[in-house]
Amino acid sequence: MLQIWVKLCLLALLFGAGNVSAQQTVTEAKIFLQSSRLAGFRYYEGRKLWPRMQLKDNLNLVREADNTYDTNAVRVEWQGHKLGYVPRAENAALARFMDRGQHPEARITALSKEKRRGRWIEFDVYLSH
């Protein structure tokens, strides 16, 4: 959470403290929240979709507040297909943002296949401001 606060302060200094002239406008700034490895990939639709997924593809994050296993659950989807979840150890702050009406964006940053561990997806999460 401190990392996010520091980034917000830096953005305020850059964009709100006179560094932008009256003629310039800032339309959108993206604030990096976290990088995560998808949890539960092998249990959902990821295996059959793997050949179609590409780096930089958008992912949809869906809050599951009523999830019986994790009250902070955030489901990860690709083109309407469930791939898995944001890992439990990394989802609390993201869930709070979503509960406050924020709509974080996510993009695939790595599609890897390791011999011992199988296929996995890594993704970054941002908030647009």
Segments and roles (model prediction):
Residues L2-L11, G16-H129:
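Conserved active-site motif detector
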